[in-house]
């Protein structure tokens, strides 16, 4: 039986198709499979100019593709050589890959270029590997989480790479040297090292130039930057940058020995870290529009809400001030950053010269237990339009700081002459009511100021001070809600070889609701406030005795005669302002007892009734003594 023409034509097509399939080699298979896998990885527009087999290697030439989405990056690759490990599909098994002549370009002008990428021990999808190139910073980010986690490798090496990127609405160039990713396991990198980085403004742009020596990052999760969802991701276990030098925004040179990082985590959210930073880069910081400010605030608020940073530490900073004078910091560290809260901000070893010829060194300056979560919440409200610039700032937006510490401060002239020193100054605050801490304690110790000129000697000689002024001070304030009182439990200033002065007082009528409404309720609170009791105590340490001796000698009088003269003058003055003769005599007697044997003198004022502070202020305008009739007065000497 003869075959029909239609059957003959069908057989010919089948033979040609089968022959074509038989001729296709591993390179063609790999090319087709990689292109087919790209759409699932948010990659598209893929084309391979040529796919050929070269011994045991598959060579793909003139490869183009791009990431998809609202910020696509187009990629051109001259050649991809895959040696070993091909499986007839997109999947690789222990392959060696060399990618040559790579360029990536985004629509906004950001781009990168590298001559060569070498990958050893590649496992997984070739399309996913190429997806790590479809980004503004190859292998630091990826086109998608699926592309970042779609492969593994023993190591990835990039000998050199140049980026053109946007920073604060300006373009800069970053040149990376010898990038190595060791132990890449589906987005997680055991170790990444960079031999050197140089960033500088692109031609015609203003900006800083910065050079960084060796960089090392451990436990880096590159998928954290592109991940969204509901779980917190550890983006970095630790890292460091060595030997940094450059110029500041004011074109002042600086160097930093080392910057190190502790664990960095990214909390879940709808936008990835890469998307957030790209949005921030698009915003002109100098933009005056309301929309620009709102967008900027929103991104910053989200970053601070979602990034948890264990520690950032800077060591060995040397630079200069705006006046060109040297500034150095031995160590600067921020610890415990989480959702607007900071455990501590710490400076040690500050050394700064000033334009007035003085040099200041500070052993340590620390700010501890900072809560700025309310400020971040306000930034979110500003971003979404529920808060506008004309509204009063709510008390919850003011940062809550629990402790400030300053140690070992020394101020000298450049000649070496000391002007003053301080051993320690500490402020501690308790929980707040509105913007006011319910408890505040401040203590200053070891303040020393030398007496350096004739004018100072003339002023301080009557107190017996000729070489130095040494003093300490302490303040403790507490708000007692039940009593509606603000109590100054102590305000004490003590000068060595002179004496100490201590003030204890209270202010009543302070309702919690009015305090919570500050600063808007300041006027109402001022009218409601009432004077409480007050005690002022002086304890002698030689100052009064020296003053009496000094002035008596200058007046050409004996000390006893001079004391009697002071007693008479004091008695006359007290009698003028205190009508109660018995009280006036008691005060005069106590004052005389103190003059005869200076040990201590205490004055206590107790309100005779409710005394509004506003009324007291009016009374005090004429004379301090005009308010005396409002109080019961008690003076005690040497108790």
Question: Which residues are covered by each model-predicted region?
Answer:
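Gram-negative bacterial Sec-dependent N-terminal signal peptides
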Residues: 1-24, 605
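Glycine-rich, small/hydroxylated-residue low-complexity segments
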Residues: 25-639
């Amino acid at each position: 039986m003869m075959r029909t023409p239609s059957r003959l034509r069908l057989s010919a097509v089948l033979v040609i198709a089968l022959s074509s399939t038989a001729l296709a080699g591993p390179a063609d298979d790999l090319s087709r499979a990689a292109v087919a896998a790209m759409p699932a990885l948010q990659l598209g527009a893929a084309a391979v100019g040529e796919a050929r087999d070269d011994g045991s290697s598959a060579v793909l030439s003139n490869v183009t593709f791009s990431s998809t989405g609202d910020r696509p990056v187009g990629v051109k690759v001259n050649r991809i050589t895959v040696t070993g490990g091909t499986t007839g599909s997109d999947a690789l098994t222990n392959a060696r890959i060399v990618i040559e002549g790579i360029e990536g370009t985004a629509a906004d002008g950001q781009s990168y270029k590298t001559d060569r990428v070498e990958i050893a021990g590649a496992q997984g999808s070739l399309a996913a590997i190429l997806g790590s190139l479809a980004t503004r910073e190859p292998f630091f980010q990826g086109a998608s989480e699926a592309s970042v986690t779609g492969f593994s490798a023993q190591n990835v090496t990039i000998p050199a790479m140049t980026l053109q990127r946007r920073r604060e609405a300006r373009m800069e160039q970053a040149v990376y040297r010898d990038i190595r990713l060791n132990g890449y396991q589906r987005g997680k990198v055991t170790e990444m090292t960079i031999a050197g980085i140089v960033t500088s403004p692109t031609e015609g742009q203003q900006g800083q130039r910065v050079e960084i020596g060796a960089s090392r990052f451990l436990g880096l999760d590159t998928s954290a930057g592109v991940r969204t969802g509901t779980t917190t991701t550890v983006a970095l276990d630790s890292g460091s940058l060595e030997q940094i030098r450059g110029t500041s925004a004011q074109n002042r040179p600086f160097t930093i020995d080392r910057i190190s990082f502790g664990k960095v985590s990214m909390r879940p959210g709808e936008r990835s870290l890469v998307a957030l930073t790209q949005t921030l880069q698009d915003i002109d910081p100098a933009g005056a529009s309301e929309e620009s400010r709102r967008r900027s605030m929103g991104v910053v608020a989200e970053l601070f809400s979602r990034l948890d940073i264990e520690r950032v530490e800077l060591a060995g900073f040397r630079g200069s001030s705006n006046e060109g004078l040297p500034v150095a910091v031995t160590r600067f560290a921020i610890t415990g950053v989480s959702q607007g809260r900071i455990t501590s901000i710490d400076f040690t070893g500050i050394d700064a010269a000033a334009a007035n010829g003085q040099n200041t060194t500070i052993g340590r300056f620390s700010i501890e237990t900072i809560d700025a979560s309310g400020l971040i919440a306000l930034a979110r409200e500003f971003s979404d339009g529920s808060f506008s610039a004309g509204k009063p700032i709510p008390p919850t937006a003011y940062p809550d700081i629990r402790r400030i510490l300053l140690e070992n401060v020394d101020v000298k002239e450049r000649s070496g002459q000391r002007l003053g020193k301080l051993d320690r100054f500490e402020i501690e605050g308790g929980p707040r009511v509105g913007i006011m801490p319910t408890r505040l304690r401040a203590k200053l110790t070891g303040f020393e100021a030398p007496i350096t000129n004739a004018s100072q000697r003339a002023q301080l000689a009557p107190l017996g001070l000729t070489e130095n002024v040494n003093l300490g001070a302490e303040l403790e304030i507490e708000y007692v809600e039940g009593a509606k009182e603000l109590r100054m439990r102590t305000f004490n200033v003590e000068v060595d070889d002179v004496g100490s002065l201590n003030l204890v007082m209270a202010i009543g009528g302070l309702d919690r609701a009015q305090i919570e409404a500050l600063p808007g309720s300041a006027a109402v609170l001022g009218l409601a406030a009432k004077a409480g009791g007050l005690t002022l105590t002086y304890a002698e340490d030689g100052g009064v005795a020296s003053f009496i001796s000094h002035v008596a000698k200058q007046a050409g009088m004996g000390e006893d005669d001079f004391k009697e003269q002071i007693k008479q003058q004091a008695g006359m003055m007290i009698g003028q302002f205190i009508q109660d003769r018995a009280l006036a005599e008691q005060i005069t007697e106590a004052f005389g007892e103190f003059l005869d044997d200076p040990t201590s003198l205490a004055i206590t004022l107790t309100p005779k009734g409710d005394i509004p502070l506003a009324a007291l202020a009016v009374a005090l305008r004429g004379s301090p003594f005009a308010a005396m009739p409002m109080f019961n007065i008690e003076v005690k000497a040497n108790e």
